[in-house]
Amino acid sequence: MIFSSLFSVVGMAVLFLIAWVFSSNKRAINYRTIVSAFVIQVALGALALYVPLGREMLQGLASGIQSVISYGYEGVRFLFGNLAPNAKGDQGIGGFVFAINVLAIIIFFASLISLLYYLKIMPLFINLIGGALQKCLGTSRAESMSAAANIFVAHTEAPLVIKPYLKSMSDSEIFAVMCVGMASVAGPVLAGYASMGIPLPYLIAASFMSAPGGLLFAKIIYPQNETISSHADVSIEKHVNAIEAIANGASTGLNLALHVGAMLLAFVGMLALINGLLGVVGGFLGMEHLSLGLILGTLLKPLAFMLGIPWSQAGIAGEIIGIKIALNEFVGYMQLLPYLGDNPPLILSEKTKAIITFALCGFANLSSVAMLIGGLGSLVPKKKDLIVRLALKAVLVGTLSNFMSATIAGLFIGLNAH
């Protein structure tokens, strides 16, 4: 146990070192912000995964969200009949169908979040969380609000919360907005992961830990050395009534679901094509099982080991994490699913499952770069060159944040097991 815990600490130190190496201005790093963000990220991990009361609260929250998702299945079942799961979560007659089980729930959840915005419930949470981050970290109001918003909405939608302030924000603040978007996932997408069978408590914990984690590494890699914007409140689209809010949310969710479905169709097919070509090449080289997963697993095995995964399981973990970074997190979670079932190809420890789940829980992948540039660039055109230049660094920050959350999760789950 002691060795495992120490290795988790070493993994954290390596992540900090990587960020420091890529820092654009090491002298400008505000260590008060860095230490405070790290303490908050660790504290959230401890509360959710180690402290008994916190674990009970997380389980209760997860059960509540799962119940809300089950109500969404009523709408899905109305459209698709017995093909859809029932309110208890029992699969339809066709078994698990991604478009029915997952994409339809994204639409329902997006509509629910839109309603919560209209009722002023979501802005209240964003203001509270964003205000707390601002006071604890010393970050600007605008970037703190954006970080809080990213817990609930996608990285293309969160900047809309602070849209009136984007033009006056410094380069470091814009970069922070990019980074927290890459480190987080949207509420509707999180519901989609849960509908796939990914453990919801881990997803919720990872989502909340992404806010301080994204700011932590953003302020190491691109420190603040300009005047920051001091005032920003949540700016939301005004709806006429609750019906319009629900309808607009459904439209937004439909666009998101179509995007996710199209991306998966393309990327899963492309993955199969790449593996087929590698299989042909491998046949000539006497390596019949050559695949992209095998290559990524071999290359990233040391990284997975550094995150706290046993060496015997690190190859599988490296493969899944690599596919997530190269393609997207949905494909990564689809690769993880067989190891969460009753007859896994390889038995993974609960700690390993948790570390992989946390490491995948973010939009930090190469396929998100175009969405980031197009979405944020359209809101603040004069900063588009900056956004393009820093997009890959934002993916790096998001990845480091997810890895830090994964390492923290592995530490506390390991301690809890003993």
Curated annotation (Swiss-Prot):
Gene null: resulting phenotype:
Mutant is deficient for transport of inosine, guanosine or adenosine.
- Say yes or no: keyword Cell inner membrane present: yes
- A GO CC annotation given for this chain: plasma membrane
Sequence intervals crossing the membrane: 2-22, 34-54, 93-113, 174-194, 198-218, 264-284, 292-314, 354-374, 395-415
Which GO molecular-function terms appear in the entry? nucleoside transmembrane transporter activity; symporter activity
Q: Where is the signal peptide?
A: none
Q: Does the keyword Transmembrane helix apply?
A: yes
How does the record classify its membrane topology?
Multi-pass membrane protein
How is this protein named in the record? Nucleoside permease NupC
Q: Which species is this UniProt entry from?
A: Helicobacter pylori (strain ATCC 700392 / 26695)
